[in-house]
């Protein structure tokens, strides 16, 4: 692993023409083979020819200090985009976001496509986790993925017509015909849900016996949401399985094109409904990159404090429900007592509990109330002893350890191939935590450790890492309590939304700006920005494209749970059904995070 302290800040926002990988690409493919796009993403964005895509991807994967993870892959409808100076002509585009762990650097490849020739080769030959991303790209934009092993809808019903993220596709329910569910349509939808093993390359049996095909979900309590897995069983052994997602899809990325930069903030809370302010962080930071806003140290620490409170809140639910899945009920009731204390604190600060929508472009909604420090101090005195009791009473239990140790185990290579992040990746021995490697919101000023496993990620290791992460979050909260800076809770910037209230009472120009920004939304410069954060379940990121409007031209939301569920078949083949239940409990996912 590379010594991170000796590296340049690759995550900072600047033009990446000087990134070493640009020179490596030009040395291999020629100086005129690419168009390098200047953005505010903080990573090099390189347009490549479709015919060279796989060759370039293979080159990056085999470099010294290679790009080993496909972090994200999706598309964009470019037809209505007006600010495209210096970019290749394109009606649509597909982007491929790759990460090099050893370099601590990313690169984004883009392919320009004509409306009359919408096709790209499948990336699954290089990265197996491209499978689901390519299915969604085809589904949302109609871009054909040549050579894909199973190009079918993934978020929408199989009977759905059209490609929802195209600019000519309606965004409001009132633009559709009224919905009617006739008996014939109901029968058609039920038939579309019938699983046919042959469609997935599965055999119905061997020469000696038939396999059983079993639906787990979409309403099974151990599925942790509206989630269906079709199991191919030989007795109790899982021969193969097919995860079926999309039941919770709400069109979050399409909504981003209809809401202002400001009014989209409440939607971010609901992408992963347990994460609260953690989900607001990447979106707000990405918008602030577009606007060129720098917030005060006080805002940074407040944001970190709220994020870590929600991290603890989410981890407590995860740990207790994992224990419940294995067979113990008591820790769940303990956890909800502890989580109530967090909600009391969050409500005192923000006015809300689960979904505060409290971060703002340029700051936070209001300053900390009187008494916040007392509530936080009481929680910090309470929680460490409770954590010890969870570990002593349940997590050291020999039955729990016997059910979870060595189950659904994978190494670093498999984790990187499937885009695994968070505790699942760190359990394999890779200490990739965005708060440490690419610090944001002042995390570089906090003293905390990153828990790392011993080389194999199994169910027990993943849950124990989360316990240690809770302790580290408590350390961070203690530092927030002891070192809360003075200063404004909103930046003095024309695009801070809404501007500080007291200024609106003194300056008519500020009052007019307040009215326009709240009613229509702030106008962001035409640019692209990107921000990833260490969320509760792995790395969450927002990739925003502005066309100089009050609304986002394209809002791409990359969630960790989507990648983690795609990994299920590879990790669970050959195990028992009872092992699958433990594995699902160890992943830490919610379906809103998967389906968006």
UniProtKB/Swiss-Prot annotation:
Q: Enumerate the UniProt keywords alphabetically.
A: Cell inner membrane, Cell membrane, Membrane, Multifunctional enzyme, NAD, Quinone, Translocase, Transport, Ubiquinone
The answer, when asked if Iron is one of the entry's keywords, is no
Provide the protein's localization: Cell inner membrane
Annotated region NADH dehydrogenase I subunit C: the residues are 1-186
Keyword Cell membrane tagged: yes
Task: Give the molecular function GO annotations.
Answer: NAD binding; NADH dehydrogenase (ubiquinone) activity; NADH:ubiquinone reductase (non-electrogenic) activity; quinone binding
The catalytic activity, as recorded, is: a quinone + NADH + 5 H(+)(in) = a quinol + NAD(+) + 4 H(+)(out)
From which domain of life does this come? Bacteria
Under Gene3D superfamilies, the record lists: Cytochrome-c3 Hydrogenase, chain B, NADH:ubiquinone oxidoreductase, 30kDa subunit
Under which main EC class is this enzyme filed? translocase
- The enzyme's E.C. designation: 7.1.1.-
Signal peptide feature range: none
Q: Which GO terms describe its cellular component?
A: NADH dehydrogenase complex; plasma membrane
Where does this protein chiefly localize? Answer: membrane
**Per its UniProt record, what NCBIfam families does this chain match?**
NuoC_fam, NuoD, PRK06075.1, PRK11742.1
- What's this protein's function? NDH-1 shuttles electrons from NADH, via FMN and iron-sulfur (Fe-S) centers, to quinones in the respiratory chain. The immediate electron acceptor for the enzyme in this species is believed to be ubiquinone. Couples the redox reaction to proton translocation (for every two electrons transferred, four hydrogen ions are translocated across the cytoplasmic membrane), and thus conserves the redox energy in a proton gradient.
Regarding protein family, the annotation reads: In the N-terminal section; belongs to the complex I 30 kDa subunit family.
Q: Spell out the protein name for this chain.
A: NADH-quinone oxidoreductase subunit C/D
Which species is this UniProt entry from? Answer: Salmonella choleraesuis (strain SC-B67)
What's the source species' lineage? Bacteria, Pseudomonadati, Pseudomonadota, Gammaproteobacteria, Enterobacterales
